[in-house]
UniProtKB/Swiss-Prot annotation:
Ca(2+) 3 binds at residues 154, 156, 158, 160, 165. This is Guanylyl cyclase-activating protein 2. Pfam families: EF-hand_7. The gene is GUCA1B. Ca(2+) 1 binds at residues 66, 68, 70, 72, 77. The keyword Flavoprotein does not apply. InterPro entries: EF-hand-dom_pair, EF_Hand_1_Ca_BS, EF_hand_dom, Recoverin. The N-terminus is blocked.
Amino acid sequence: MGQEFSWEEAEAAGEIDVAELQEWYKKFVMECPSGTLFMHEFKRFFKVTDDEEASQYVEGMFRAFDKNGDNTIDFLEYVAALNLVLRGTLEHKLKWTFKIYDKDGNGCIDRLELLNIVEGIYQLKKACRRELQTEQGQLLTPEEVVDRIFLLVDENGDGQLSLNEFVEGARRDKWVMKMLQMDMNPSSWLAQQRRKSAMF
């Protein structure tokens, strides 16, 4: 599911100072004494239990962070991911989001891939209905969100979103940006987790 982010993207997001890195390491080791974060722990952080769509979405994020594909997140992968999420530019975050959405890794997002992601996000964001509404306050179904995104972003009408269409569509339209990035509100999520857990 999805592709991995590159170390170059994480590095381009900004440098981490040594003191901050040491603090992250202490917290990581306290929470993950084995030195690795497993899928079930990752899901627990997102409070994902039995919901299939939300579970698939979180698994996609996990795989995007799991650079070497060993089904765990080690400290270096953790740091690279946090650096990208917390400090990355809008373009880096959109590229990373695109890679999560592109489940089959073919470089394009089709309607079914986007629908699966939007359904998962709806499950994760049940309490945040505001984020799922249009400018007029209308709550759209996942299918309506996908239709509207394709209408606004699929420039060549081929039924697939390329990376360029994805990034440019988000830059052009505020609503599209909100919909394409509604999973990428990691700063507030991480702030909540910092209060609840020593992990972050």
